[in-house]
Amino acid sequence: IDALKTRLGDVALVVCLDSGAGNYDQLWLTTSLRGMVAGTLKVEILTEGVHSGDASGLVPSSFRVMRQVLDRLEDSATGRLLPASFHCEVPAERLAQARATAAILGQEITQRFPWAHYDCGGSSAFALPTTQDPVQALLKRTWEPTLSVTGAEGFPALQDAGNVLRPYTAFKLS
């Protein structure tokens, strides 16, 4: 703003459309966003890769150990984070706002994302949201804690992968 002060003049209000908008038919105000904690989780077992035929079964897979660590944080069947300290009660006012927003947007809340779908030999398989209920969808996006893996390290590209037990697995978590 300081760099553009001569062009903008005296700025009294800045609107940032970064948290998403319900639609482009109305102006939306963000009242609820969950916080974020990010970090890198690394499980290192070996100092270098070794032949899997020689080592697997004796040397634990860094990916398996990573899964065990993540299972302490998240129920992999439901996606629910396990530590109670990540959860809070949604205030009544915010719940009422979520209901009002859901009444306006309906299924657009979930349909706005580019879901993958494939014809699997005649039976269609679809990736689906964790809920079809618009109110719950809003609460899951803004109030409920969730775990996302946003990056990975320690994996070769598929075309370069061989019979090697990898020395480590690292995930960027958010």
What are these model-predicted stretches?
Residues T6-G9, G22, Q26, T31, ...:
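Acidic-enriched catalytic cores of C-N bond-cleaving enzymes acting on peptides and small amides
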Residues L27-T31, L158-N163:
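Short beta-strand/turn micro-motifs at beta-sheet edges
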Residues L41-V43, T169-S174:
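Short, hydrophobic beta-strand segments
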Residues T47-G53, L158-Q159:
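Short small-residue beta-strand/loop micro-motif enriched in glycine and branched aliphatics
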